[in-house]
From Swiss-Prot:
Name of the protein in its database record: Large ribosomal subunit protein bL9
Lineage of origin: Bacteria, Pseudomonadati, Pseudomonadota, Gammaproteobacteria, Pseudomonadales
Summary of the function given for this chain in its UniProt record: Binds to the 23S rRNA.
UniProt keyword annotations, A-Z: Ribonucleoprotein, Ribosomal protein, RNA-binding, rRNA-binding
Disulfide-linked positions: none
Length: 148
């Protein structure tokens, strides 16, 4: 399936690239989320007319992500959770909890932007958490988990 990318897609290509992808990936992900359009002659011509507008939009998104990353770099978030005597939490701290704490601190962060490669946080302590704001912009936030 031939598609034209309308924005940068990780491990696939940049804005305006003509890519050949499997039909399921194109139909179920790229097309519904507005990340690509079918590479027909009419769509190619329409894309070339809108290219400057889309490039400006992509640059604005990246600039916005960079300002949010600068705000997040200065931030340290404290999350209080109930824990046992040895510092093990009753439950866990996940991406949703971290995103809510960051949003409460004044920087809007979606749950899907928070990355926990080692899984949820299950112990009291300090953790460095990656926040993936844009395909080119990633920030690290210090999360402190304290016992209630």
């Amino acid at each position: 399936m031939q598609l034209i990318l309308l924005e940068k897609v990780a491990n696939l290509g940049n804005l305006g690239d003509k890519v050949n992808v499997k039909a399921g990936y194109g139909r179920n992900y790229l097309l519904p989320y507005g990340k690509a359009t079918a590479a027909t002659a009419a769509n190619v011509a329409a894309f070339e007319e809108r290219r400057a507008e889309l490039e400006k939009l992509a640059a604005d998104k990246k600039a916005s992500a960079e300002t949010r990353a600068a705000q997040l770099a200065e931030l340290e978030v404290t999350i209080t959770a109930t824990a046992g005597d040895e510092g093990k939490l009753f439950g866990s701290i996940g991406t949703h909890d971290i995103a809510d704490a960051l949003t409460a601190s004044g920087v809007e962060v979606a749950k899907s932007e928070v990355r926990l490669p080692n899984g949820t946080i299950r112990n009291v302590g300090e953790y460095d958490v990656a926040v993936h704001l844009h395909s080119d912009v990633e920030a690290t936030v210090r999360v402190v988990v304290v016992a209630a």
